[in-house]
Amino acid sequence: MPSFDVVCEANMVELKNAVEQANKEISTRFDFKGSDARVEHKDQELTLFGDDDFKLGQVKDVLLTKLAKRGVDVRFLDYQDKQKIGGDKMKQVVKIKKGVSGELSKKIVKLIKDSKIKVQGSIQGDAVRVSGAKRDDLQAVIAMLRKDVTDTPLDFNNFRD
């Protein structure tokens, strides 16, 4: 019985490459000369640093550009509040979303049941397993989920036949 998993996880290798490219551009840009602007990556979060609110926004723009070029969906990023860290310096923590939330997984299973396609959806931790008799049905479910779930980036992996 063919099946696949619906997950929500960023490509961490590409994310790391985008952060390194952003830091390289920030270090060479004229408008950041002598500033302490940078992006730090640790586990499941990024930290943006800037000399003031405007420079922090510029760092964010550079990072988003590099992420888009590397093919990392920016919907994985969850921006926290900006914080002052002494003087005029600012920082902003950006959490990286991982796993399908309980609410979203229930929504995905409900969408699958309402679609009347002959497949079953089951919640398994932070993923949703979809299994059906035909591969064509699974492809129809993937197309339907890509169309209907737009607020969260979904990946489809662990295909079994």
Curated annotation (Swiss-Prot):
What are the UniProt keywords, alphabetically? Nucleotide-binding
SUPFAM superfamilies xrefs? YajQ-like
Which ranges does the record mark as transmembrane?
none
MF terms from GO for this chain are: nucleotide binding
Q: List S-S links within the chain.
A: none
Task: List the GO cellular component terms.
Answer: cytosol
Q: Which family does it belong to?
A: Belongs to the YajQ family.
Q: What is this protein called?
A: Nucleotide-binding protein RSc2549
Q: Which organism is it from?
A: Ralstonia nicotianae (strain ATCC BAA-1114 / GMI1000) (Ralstonia solanacearum)
